[in-house]
Amino acid sequence: MADATASFDESGLRAVTATPRAAGDSLATAGVWEANAESLAAYATFCRTALFAPAQSPQWVRHWTEQVRPDTVVATLAVGGRPVLALALEIERHGPFRVARFMGGRHANGNFAAADPVWLETAAGPATRPLFDAIAAARPDIDVVALQRLLPDLDGRANPLAALPSHNSPNLSLAVDLEGGFEAVLSRTSGKRKRKKHRSQTRKFESAGGFRRLDAGTPEEVHSLLYAFFAMKEFRFRRMGIANVFGDPQVRIFFHKLFAEALKEDGAPFRLHGLEVGGKLRAVTGSSVSDRRLVCEFGAISEDDLAHASPGDFLFFENIRETCERGFSVYDFSVGDEPYKRQWCDIEIRHLDALVPLTLKGRMLASCLRGNAGIKSFIKNSPAIWSLTKTLRRKTAGKRLPAEED
């Protein structure tokens, strides 16, 4: 077997490679490594000139590997001896199956694997096949590679993984076109009503002891906002009757590390904002930067005496205004179709789920996952059924449902 990915890492790591295949006029080969210090350093080096989504950034991948410590691999595709695509994956056991997925699980949304921008101009779905052959050869225990919530494109370049056999993700993603600045955004989204509500909220918050919007600029501020956010989410998930996807202590440490370490980098690729009223945090958002797109990765409000004043809406108003002032072109609310997002959004993004079975068991699992996604899509696209589902879920709040049911 030829080591076609030596240029990916010059430290001499051994890679398991797939049988070379023709890709245009060049030879495409692939390699797979355990995600260790050397391969993660090589991944970071490749990302310096690559295009990728926030959840595939070197920072996200490194902190997830170090803090959550899953079973992980880094797979690379090279064309003509030059790396063009890198997949950082974690492997999880689901019953009798092993599934490889993007690091971060359900926290990884709007996914776009690290890829060479020049290669993306001509890349096609079949060109990625050697990558999955290599994964199957290196890790025959993996049944399915589940690449979920894929962005169809990023910065005008098509996602090569979206060309794989895929289906629509059950959850829609919503975003705001910021063209023309904040005034233009308001003019397109009931701006008069929004301004009136914002003024009313301002008066309520001032009478409740004053308010301030926080932009976490120190590790201490990061930790303070995250502690508050996790408490808000814990309360809400318990009330809704679903498992808390932020409940794992290692996942919480991951986010603390991710946002605190991001402060050391130019432009802070991950940022926290909060709204404090009367000396108490009432709303928190966590965002990532993807070129000229700001992505709200998560948010929560304190369900207390001021919840009726919609502190979350107030914070989004200020966040979107600042995002416009900073010259971004899109404010992305990420996954989930909710009324508070619809008040702003004029862009719908349909993510894709690509399932690549590597074993006979994997084919069976992929078929079940596709069927499950179809059922979820039907439920969530049927307002009456979805409303009934959420009502039943709240009534069974003492019996935790899987987080995937959200």
Where are these regions (language model features)?
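Intrinsically disordered, low-complexity, positively biased terminal segments
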Residues: 2-4, 114-158, 162, 216-217, ...
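Active-site/acyl-donor-binding loops of N-acyltransferases
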Residues: 2-27, 152-184, 189, 293, ...
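A conserved beta-strand-loop-helix scaffold within acyl/acetyltransferase catalytic domains
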Residues: 25-102, 149-173, 181, 186-308, ...
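Intrinsic-disorder-associated interaction segments
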Residues: 36, 54, 121-124, 191-194, ...
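Acyl-donor binding region in acyl/amide transferases
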Residues: 72, 92-169, 290-349
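A broadly tuned preference for mixed-charge, low-complexity surface segments
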Residues: 86-90, 124-145, 192-210, 229, ...
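Short intrinsically disordered coil segments
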Residues: 104, 128-130, 188-195, 369-374
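Low-complexity, flexible helical/coil segments
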Residues: 110-115, 120-125, 180-186, 209-213, ...
